């Protein structure tokens, strides 16, 4: 649940949302000075925080140090700017591993199945994607052909 506004407004809205929805709520703040300040306050209060609009490893380190539960590097938007979004995910994941940081990497702005798989391969624990991309994860031509063979075999058994 994303919060916007001044640091004070974001903090109070985050607390309000947590009071209303409990621990199922994760409060989403931007990776700005104000957002990271709010992240620290909310995480100190025991509230899960996702720091979003991450575009480099240094931002992800600052977010983790502020107590972020999740960080969201925007792979698709980085790729749009000719920056290797998956390399940013890999760098963040590797830094977290080396330093024992428990913040989870959530690859955002995923626009293809291949980008999702490569995100997971590069250390992301979670990927967000449009429903169309998620649905494509089920599809494979060999599965379709296999189902056709199974169906024909089944019809042969029933005769």
Protein language model features and the residues they cover:
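Alpha-helix-loop-beta-strand connector modules within alpha/beta enzyme cores
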Residues: 19-21, 36-49, 84-105, 147-159
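Active-site beta-loop-alpha junctions enriched in small/polar residues
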Residues: 2-6, 30-34, 54-56, 76, ...
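Active-site beta->alpha loop and helix N-cap motifs at the rims of alpha/beta catalytic domains
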Residues: 1-45, 75
């Amino acid at each position: 649940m994303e919060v916007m506004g001044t640091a004070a407004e974001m903090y109070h809205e985050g607390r309000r949302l947590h009071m209303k929805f409990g621990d199922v709520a994760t409060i989403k703040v931007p990776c700005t000075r104000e957002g990271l300040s709010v992240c620290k306050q909310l995480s100190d209060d025991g509230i899960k925080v996702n720091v979003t609009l991450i575009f480099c490893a240094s931002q992800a380190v600052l977010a983790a140090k502020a107590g972020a539960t999740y960080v969201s590097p925007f792979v698709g938007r980085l790729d749009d700017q000719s920056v290797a979004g998956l390399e940013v995910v890999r760098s963040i994941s590797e830094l977290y591993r080396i330093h024992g940081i428990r913040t989870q990497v959530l690859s955002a702005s995923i626009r293809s199945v291949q980008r999702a798989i490569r995100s997971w391969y590069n250390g992301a624990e979670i990927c967000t994607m449009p429903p169309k991309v998620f649905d494509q994860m089920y599809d494979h031509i060999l599965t379709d052909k296999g189902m056709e063979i199974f169906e024909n075999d089944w019809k042969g058994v029933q005769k």
